[in-house]
Regions:
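Alpha-helical transmembrane segments and their lipid-water interface positions
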Residues: 28, 32-35, 39, 61-68, ...
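Helix-terminus/linker motif at the lipid-water interface of multi-pass membrane proteins
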Residues: 30-48, 116-123, 179-190, 251-278, ...
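N-terminal transmembrane alpha-helices
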Residues: 6-37, 41-42, 55-74, 99-106, ...
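Short runs within selected transmembrane alpha-helices of multi-pass transporters and secretion channels
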Residues: 68, 72, 136-154, 162-170, ...
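Small-residue-rich hydrophobic transmembrane alpha-helices
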Residues: 47-110, 143-157, 161-162, 275-336, ...
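Interfacial/gating helices of multi-pass transporter permease domains
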Residues: 39-58, 124-131, 192-193, 234-242, ...
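Transmembrane helical elements of multi-pass membrane transporters/channels
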Residues: 16-35, 135, 169, 202-206, ...
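Short alpha-helical transmembrane segments in multi-pass integral membrane proteins
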Residues: 1-21, 75-141, 187-244, 300-368, ...
Length: 458
């Protein structure tokens, strides 16, 4: 029973780190939610295009974001080991990586735009998707640099800085998006392009706030910022050794999800709009839990650096209590209120009944897997913080791509219909969560030898 007893101190620390990150990620979810709501006021096609274009742009960025965001765990490990001067050096190595990543991202984005036509999307949907996608890719370098600083502040447990920067960015984004979409307050009416431009401007604004925190005098003195602006091959080697598997996992998983979404949207406008509606609510549940995931990575990394495995176990238990408690409430709401939640995004039109019927069915599936999502984020945070990124990469990627192959036969070969495809998607998430829990219960990732390899800079 002692193993399952949760210490108040650990829970308090987790919540103090997680709360600002949940607010930050929640603000991001609100931004996406309002963007798509504004699009739905124009037409279901515009809303579907914002989903397809947004997911495709994140797909292109995901490899680089996955690598750069591992700064959270690296910084936390150095912070726990009391090597504060190395924390800011992690940021410098991340910025060095950005010099190569940004041109590569622009090239990848240029060729990725053709996927919309290859997947057989309706011409009117494809045109809007490409407009939204290419503008987001143009400003994607800002997002990569912002990831370095956000991950750093999470690693040193200064998540209030992340909350302030991201929340103020969203406060700017929402009215700016409305103005640039509909052409009010002296702005031109740009439609879906206006939403993309507003996203870039607000990201740049958030980055400026991060820079102000980073170069603040007391912070510069404590973490030796002025002495950190050098190439450190040892830290860079750790960054790539542990971060690349994390980036590859994110890239291939997002690729699999993106291809599934593109195939699902090829059913037609009703199915594309229904997917957009349900994933809007998925974001509301999933994105705030990413804040919990970030906090768990930070705390586990710190206790790995301190070599304090007892406190690490407490983080695991506390994370499960928070994650499953939050997601269980959402699961009940998604079932009980599925019809009014869907109706928010459905305007009167020729496809209204079809969109309502399919979306309500899909909301039940969302309620089914929301607790599995919480499990994935808690366990994934623990394993990433402990440096078990290779296992995560192999298992997660294999399961996602196996699902994609199954979906190809369901959607394209046997033409079994959108409800069957959605059930397959839900089952895949449940199976992945079960595999993660089995790994967490094992011993291989937390042996002294494994943890020593994680901390080594050679």
């Amino acid at each position: 029973m002692k193993y399952f007893k949760i210490e108040k101190e650990t829970m308090s620390q987790l919540l103090s780190i997680a709360y600002p990150m949940v607010v930050s990620q929640g603000a991001f979810a609100v931004m996406i939610f309002t963007d798509r709501y504004f699009m739905s006021l124009i037409s279901p096609t515009h809303m579907a295009a914002s989903l397809g274009g947004g997911v495709a742009s994140f797909f292109c960025m995901s490899l680089f974001i996955g690598i750069l965001s591992y700064a959270n765990a690296l910084v936390a490990q150095y912070y726990g080991a009391k090597e504060l001067e190395k924390c800011t050096r992690v940021v410098t190595q991340g910025l060095i990586l950005c010099v190569g990543f940004i041109p590569s991202l622009l090239i990848i984005g240029y060729f990725t735009g053709s996927l919309f036509s290859i997947m057989g999307h309706a011409p009117e949907l494809e045109i809007l998707e490409k407009k939204y996608f290419y503008i987001l890719i143009f400003g994607s370098g800002i997002g990569l640099i912002k990831t370095c600083f956000a991950s750093y502040f999470a690693g040193i447990a200064k998540t209030r800085a992340v909350m302030i920067a991201d929340t103020l960015g969203v406060v700017l984004n929402i009215p700016l998006t409305y103005a640039m979409i509909f052409g009010v307050w002296q702005f031109p009416e740009l439609g879906i392009e206006g939403a993309a431009y507003a996203t870039i401007v607000s990201s740049l604004f958030s980055l400026c706030i991060f820079l102000a925190f980073y170069f603040q005098r007391l912070h510069r003195q404590r973490y030796l910022v002025d002495q950190s602006l050098v190439l450190d091959k040892g830290i860079l080697g750790r960054y790539l050794r542990l971060g690349v598997p994390s980036g590859v996992e994110m890239f291939l998983n997002v690729a699999a999800f993106n291809l599934f979404l593109l195939m699902y949207q090829s059913y037609g406008v009703i199915e594309a709009a229904s997917a957009a509606i349900v994933f809007n609510w998925d974001i509301v549940s999933f994105v705030p839990m990413i804040g919990l995931n970030v906090a768990i990575i930070s705390m586990v990394g710190r206790f790995i650096g301190e070599n304090n495995l007892d406190r690490m176990r407490q983080v695991v238990l506390s994370g499960f209590l928070v994650g499953l408690g939050y997601s269980s409430i959402l699961a009940i709401l998604f079932v009980a209120l599925r019809e009014p939640l869907v109706a928010i995004f459905v305007a009167d039109g020729p496809n209204t009944d079809g969109i309502m019927e399919l979306s309500i069915f899909m909301m039940v599936g969302l309620a089914t897997y929301v607790m599995a999502d919480a499990t994935l984020l808690v366990v994934g945070g623990v394993l990433r913080g402990a440096g078990d990124t290779r296992w995560l990469m192999w298992v997660s990627v294999l399961l996602h791509w196996f699902m994609l192959i199954v979906q190809y036969f369901v959607i394209k070969v046997f033409e079994l219909g959108p409800k069957t495809a959605w059930v397959v998607f839900v089952v895949m998430i449940l199976i992945t969560a079960a595999c993660y829990v089995l790994r967490l219960r094992g011993e291989k990732w937390r042996t002294p030898e494994a943890l020593a390899r994680v901390m080594a800079e050679q």
